[in-house]
Amino acid sequence: VIAIQGNFDRALATVQEVANQYPITLVNSVNPYRLEGQKTAAFEVVDALGEAPDWLCIPVGNAGNITAYWMGFNEYKRAGHSRCLPRMMGFQAAGSAPLVLGHTVEQPDTIATAIRIGNPVNKENALKARSESNGDFMAVTDAEIIEAYKLLGSGEGVFCEPASAASVAGLIKRRAEVPAGATVVCVLTGNGLKDPSTAIENNDSRFHTGLAPDTDVVAKVMGF
């Protein structure tokens, strides 16, 4: 593992140059073969539901996932496995929202490290997915991301990385627009162990200081 100084965009530009000059394969989503693999997640969604969802909510950083999912839904529909296509709803962190703002963000900043990207390499494909699906891009704040992050942990027992929670934060923000009876899928893109410090820093004081070594106290916190 090699650490490169600067942000994601600078690091990606560097490794692209390295890959162009040396016998190295870049497996970032700039690589079309990666998208071909990622698109199969859309197949799995349709297989699980029996049809494409009405909305597909997804975090957007480098925009590879939203590009790949849209590819997958279209291919599966053409193959006769579904009758409809979802609205592609992409959510970016407010401090790193180039697709929402319409321009590159030179110094992206967000707690959601996986989408802390100011110049997504798949931006044109993502814009196409939004346009073709009648979808939308929207920014969510770090506070909204953390709220959704905690909700997923406490309500669903899912420990995801902060970037993943952006899809749920976005759905919460847009919930009034969801048609009655609609099927909505939120994609969680990464495990919480990718960014465990967020769980520690954003937990309540009981996690930091510990509970008194008392059976009743511990049982109460556990909900008994």
What residue spans do the PLM features occupy?
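Active-site/ligand-binding loops adjacent to catalytic centers
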Residues: 1-33, 75-159, 201-224
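A structured beta-alpha segment of the ubiquitous adenosine-cofactor-binding alpha/beta core
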Residues: 27-50, 77
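Short glycine/serine/threonine-rich phosphate/pyrophosphate-binding segments
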Residues: 35, 62-69, 96-100, 163-171
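Glycine-rich ThDP/TPP pyrophosphate-binding loop and its adjacent helix/strand module
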Residues: 39, 45, 49-71
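Beta-strand segments within the central parallel beta-sheet cores of soluble alpha/beta enzyme folds
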Residues: 54-56, 83-92, 182-187
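Short glycine/threonine-rich catalytic loop with a Thr-x-Gly-x-Asp
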Residues: 60-64, 122, 156-164
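Catalytic phosphate/nucleotide-handling subdomain of diverse soluble enzymes
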Residues: 168-224
